[in-house]
From Swiss-Prot:
The modification N6-(pyridoxal phosphate)lysine is found at residue 235. Belongs to the SHMT family. Its cofactor is pyridoxal 5'-phosphate. The gene is mshmt. (6S)-5,6,7,8-tetrahydrofolate binds at residues 126, 130-132, 251. Pathway: One-carbon metabolism; tetrahydrofolate interconversion. It catalyses: (6R)-5,10-methylene-5,6,7,8-tetrahydrofolate + D-alanine + H2O = 2-methylserine + (6S)-5,6,7,8-tetrahydrofolate. This is 2-methylserine hydroxymethyltransferase.
Length: 425
């Protein structure tokens, strides 16, 4: 082995790329020392990290187990088949495609399968908690299809199923979509399936945010009501970045294989498939049900604590991991609130709420999520404490005393992160 080869195979990132090494070290420290309250984030297990950094990342493959376009894929076949089998068992469905690189890629594959350019789709309005890949104009789905929206009731901010039915009868969509990125309430899949059937639409559920809750029995399953289901393996599933597509329709499944490859993707990410299989296996264990039950308890406590401090919670509470705040009564916008929490080492994100401004700079909403902090082991007492810290920070920001309050809050955050640490390294 010559020196160049020896260096290539044996040098760490700290040896070869100080800039990136420093960024990686800084990110590790950030995750260790900050409390993550972004609803779309979680913390993966060490086993998932092991898979993501494995040599399997070197293997290029196209096709499916037993039917590949490249040789040497026998061990990737093992992990992909395990991921398929575990997904089917976890979500009690007949067929699973585990190759999508993301939830949006999974959605695109379903569109490729079920609808044609110009067809009508009906989905939850983005400001009401929907997702950009469900027909937003800035997304390909909004350019390819004639997108229409249903909304939440202006009084209780919960999906108005009667109004959804009225719109569906008027629009006659080819595809009815539910799910999104900021809807905190339980979804009535049975009612929506009835609406879809009544108007002759396919019914698709994007459960990216609630997949872990469904898997652990903390939210009703979209099966047997949905025709097809997509999700991510991140968020409440605590896995790597990637997507899944699930169905009970054998004919669709066969067509779905080609919709994913070569329809919207090329080669698969072999190491990510291994990580997906691991996280799905973790979700099949009894302790995962305990985890998601705690997630919902923690979210409810956080919402109740913030409400008791005079902060309005959209829809009056939550049934999931998401708590959506209306900051207008505090005279703040979402970015100001996000910055106020960030100064105290709490990460969050601004978010639109129902009937919010279309301009992100003017959004008055903030989305909080409890999944990552629950993974660290925090329970109700910690979330009462966190809720009061968040309320203190928002009140101080509104009064012009944000930086001073942040210094005090940092002490509590440090106590919590030290009491509930992450990885040993």
């Amino acid at each position: 082995m010559n020196e160049l080869t020896r260096t290539f195979f044996n040098s760490s990132v700290h040896d070869t790329d100080p800039l990136i090494a420093q960024a990686l070290d800084d990110e590790r420290a950030r995750q260790k020392n900050q409390i993550e309250l972004i609803a779309s984030e979680n913390i993966v297990s060490q086993a998932v990290l092991d898979a993501l950094g494995h040599e399997m990342t070197n293997k290029t493959l196209e096709g499916y187990p037993g039917n590949r376009f490249h040789g040497g894929g026998q061990f990737v076949d093992v992990v992909e088949q395990a991921a398929i089998d575990r997904a089917k068992q976890l979500f009690n469905c007949g067929y699973a495609n585990v190759q999508p690189h993301s939830g949006t890629q999974a959605n695109l594959a379903v569109f490729f399968l079920l609808v044609k350019p110009g067809d009508r789709i009906l989905s939850l309005d983005l400001a009401a908690g929907g997702h950009l890949s469900h027909g937003m104009k800035g997304n390909l789905s909004g350019r390819w299809f004639e997108a229409h929206n249903y909304n939440v009731d202006p009084q209780n901010e919960v999906i108005n199923y009667d109004e959804m039915e009225r719109i569906a009868e008027e629009v006659k969509p080819k595809l009815l979509i539910t799910g999104g990125s900021a809807y905190p309430r339980e979804l009535d899949f049975a009612r929506m399936a009835q609406i879809a059937k009544k108007v002759g639409a396919f019914f698709m559920v994007d459960m990216a945010h609630i997949a872990g809750l469904v898997a652990g029995g903390a939210h009703p399953s979209p099966f047997p009501h949905a025709d097809i289901v997509t999700c991510t393996t991140t968020k409440t599933l605590r896995g790597p970045r990637g997507g899944l597509i699930l169905t009970n329709n054998e004919e669709w499944y066969k067509k779905l294989q080609t919709a994913v490859f070569p329809g919207v993707q090329g080669s698969l990410h072999s190491n990510v498939l291994a990580a997906k299989a691991i996280c799905l296996g973790e979700a099949l264990r009894p302790e995962f049900r305990d985890y998601v039950a705690q997630v919902v308890k923690n979210a409810k406590v956080l919402a109740e604590t913030l409400t008791s401090r005079g902060i309005r919670i959209v829809s009056g509470g939550t049934d999931t991991h998401i708590v959506l705040l209306d900051l207008s009564s505090k005279g703040l916008n979402g970015k100001q609130a996000e910055d106020a929490l960030a100064r105290a080492n709490i990460t969050s994100n601004k978010n639109p709420i129902p009937n919010d401004s279309p301009r992100p700079a003017e959004w008055v909403g903030m989305r909080l999520g409890v999944s990552a902090a629950t993974t660290r082991g925090m329970k109700e007492d910690e979330f009462r404490k966190l809720g009061n810290v968040v309320a203190d920070l928002l009140e101080a920001e509104s009064a012009g005393n944000g930086p001073e309050a942040a210094e005090k809050a940092k002490v509590t955050v440090r106590e919590l992160t030290e009491a509930f640490p992450v990885y040993a390294h």
